[in-house]
Amino acid sequence: MPFLGQDWRSPGWSWIKTEDGWKRCESCSQKLERENNRCNISHSIILNSEDGEIFNNEEHEYASKKRKKDHFRNDTNTQSFYREKWIYVHKESTKERHGYCTLGEAFNRLDFSSAIQDIRRFNYVVKLLQLIAKSQLTSLSGVAQKNYFNILDKIVQKVLDDHHNPRLIKDLLQDLSSTLCILIRGVGKSVLVGNINIWICRLETILAWQQQLQDLQMTKQVNNGLTLSDLPLHMLNNILYRFSDGWDIITLGQVTPTLYMLSEDRQLWKKLCQYHFAEKQFCRHLILSEKGHIEWKLMYFALQKHYPAKEQYGDTLHFCRHCSILFWKDYHLALLFKDSGHPCTAADPDSCFTPVSPQHFIDLFKF
């Protein structure tokens, strides 16, 4: 018969019925504490001064380790990642499994922290964070929000260190700051998990990141080896044709006059439009020059405002339709050990795998 004390978090007292009536039974922790006290008394009697000094040093070392451990647990920058390569996605309760998997739980358990270090997965994770910032930020739990901003911090530091794709991160931070401004202004109307002061501090951090990226300067590398300008024209042209983003083509065209000439090629922009958009969409947004030629470059940016461009990623999460498991697929392990990336029971696992786009990842957890 538990007795609930004044502190609602207390487990209360435990009582047991005996022949003489109800008696309070002591918990195991109290018994252990009493035994420890007895041991400490006996130790103080037995130990001499030299042994006592050693014993005190051990106690001091233990207390120091405990403080560090508590600090690690309470540190707001500490990440709560499981570092798992796969998770089971269940959308309803069953006899075997209670509850369901939420977006925040999936975000916590999948190893996004290591994924941003892989250049093939970097853009994928950034796009996923951007979609969460636009529409799913309020659906994340407190732990998931902390992990979200810790991953974002790692991404910003990575961009500041290696200058990899800063424009993509600027777009992400712009969307995130806009969402936070709206949520903070409408506090009380929107479901914003956590203290409002924490969110204001996070917004200030985002503004500081934006300023750091704005001040980012590309240092000129002093290298006597082969540079991009030394390559033949047909190789430079081949590089430009590999790009799937129009802004990347424009940015590269600003490096040298030769690259600018190649970046203005009408055929290049035509191929880019055909890759991202359908022919029916061309007809609705035709832009002609004074001579009657189609302005493919202007059409690309016009179509981009009306239709979503085709997304292309080096590596993505995969979903197994047979096992209902979401996982990262390690291609090196798959080639060497025929590892599917998760414990799959299908006869032909590869036929059950589906690449998961960032939007599909969000949709998986809409119940």
UniProtKB/Swiss-Prot annotation:
Pathway(s) per entry: Protein modification; protein ubiquitination
Give any Gene Ontology cellular component.
nucleus
Q: What's the superkingdom here? A: Eukaryota
Q: Does Nucleus count among this protein's keywords? A: yes
Record keywords: Actin-binding, Chromosomal rearrangement, Nucleus, Ubl conjugation pathway
Give me the ranges of the annotated region Interaction with beta-actin.
1-83
Q: Which residues form the F-box domain?
A: 226-274
- Which GO MF term does the entry hold, naming one? actin binding
Q: Which Gene3D superfamilies match?
A: 1.20.1280.50
Summarize tissue expression: Expressed in all brain tissue observed.
GO biological process entries: protein ubiquitination
What main location does UniProt list? nucleus
Q: Where in the cell is it found?
A: Nucleus
- Main function: Substrate-recognition component of the SCF (SKP1-CUL1-F-box protein)-type E3 ubiquitin ligase complex. May play a role in accumulation of expanded polyglutamine (polyQ) protein huntingtin (HTT).
> Which pathological condition is tied to this protein?
A chromosomal aberration involving FBXO25 is a cause of X-linked intellectual disability (XLID). Translocation t(X;8)(p11.22;p23.3) with SHROOM4.
Q: What is known of its domains?
A: The F-box is necessary for the interaction with SKP1.
| Assembly with partners or alone | Part of a SCF (SKP1-cullin-F-box) protein ligase complex consisting of FBXO25, SKP1, CUL1 and RBX1. Interacts directly with SKP1 and CUL1. Interacts (via C-terminus) with beta-actin (via N-terminus).
Q: What is this protein called?
A: F-box only protein 25
Can you name the source organism?
Answer: Homo sapiens (Human)
